[in-house]
Regions:
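Extracytoplasmic/periplasmic, Sec-exported soluble proteins
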Residues: 2-5, 24-29, 79-82, 104-115, ...
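Segments of small-molecule ligand-sensing domains
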Residues: 96-109, 120-191
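Extracellular/periplasmic periplasmic-binding protein-like sensory domains
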Residues: 37-114, 195-202
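Extracellular/periplasmic catalytic domains that process cell-envelope and extracellular macromolecules
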Residues: 14-16, 39-41, 61-65, 134, ...
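Active-site-proximal beta-strand/loop segments in catalytic clefts of secreted hydrolases
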Residues: 1, 23-27, 49-53, 72-76, ...
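Sec/Tat-exported extracytoplasmic proteins
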Residues: 13-17, 22-25, 37-41, 73, ...
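Extracellular/periplasmic Venus flytrap/periplasmic-binding protein
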Residues: 1-40, 78-85
Length: 206
């Protein structure tokens, strides 16, 4: 309930006039914040959310009122990828999924699909490394630490340009952490930047 009661915070923002507002949000907090920002006339192209704060569920109901709002992401929206087209053709259209036809291509659907790709790749790597058909949790962890979703493999899977390469290791479970920025155009999310690497030399010592 409290996440939907933001008026006083946005009145403070209107008074102090910051150059940018960054939102680490989730759930009902996101559309409420975007709505309040628009109501107080804060420029939405100066309002950016983290990757929890930039899905279709956060902006669709607001439509053009949310136009300009920014969010980070690590998977691209849309269905213009062979892998997504195959999911639609072989899974969604034949009725083998509870997903509605309009869901593939949206932020959360594509992100969940890529999560499934990572797990499937980890299992495959684990099977190859251990020689087992039925792998254990420890085996899959080994697979995750040796996963290699480089540009060539992403292209082979039908996901060229979909996300940053994912190269697993014990030392780096974040895989570098690169993201890009997407923007709501009033009806859909559009990717507006290339991949942006984190400033680990600045952040990690903190």
């Amino acid at each position: 309930k409290e996440m939907q009661n933001q008026s006083s915070h946005w009145l403070t923002i209107r008074k102090e006039k910051p150059d940018w507002v960054i939102m680490w949000g989730g759930g009902a907090m996101n559309p409420t914040a975007i709505k309040e920002a628009a109501k107080t006339r804060f420029p939405l192209d100066r309002f950016i959310g983290n990757w929890w704060s930039g899905a279709h569920v956060d902006t669709e109901a607001l439509g053009s009122k949310a136009k300009g709002y920014l969010a980070s992401s690590f998977t691209t929206t849309g269905t213009d990828f062979p892998a997504v087209q195959d999911v639609i053709k072989y899974v969604v259209k034949p009725g083998k999924s509870k997903t509605e036809m309009g869901m593939p291509g949206k932020v959360l659907y594509n992100r969940a699909m890529f999560n499934a790709v990572i797990i499937a790749e980890a299992i495959t790597v684990a099977q190859k490394m251990t020689g087992k058909k039925n792998v254990t949790g420890a085996d899959v962890r080994l697979g995750l630490e040796n996963i290699k979703l480089d540009e060539a493999r992403l292209k082979e899977l039908g996901l060229e340009g979909f996300t940053a390469p994912v190269i697993g290791s014990c030392a780096d479970h974040e895989n570098g952490g690169s993201i890009f920025v997407q923007q709501w155009d009033g009806s859909d999310w559009k990717r507006i930047t290339g991949l942006i690497p984190p400033m680990t030399d600045v952040v990690q010592p903190l």
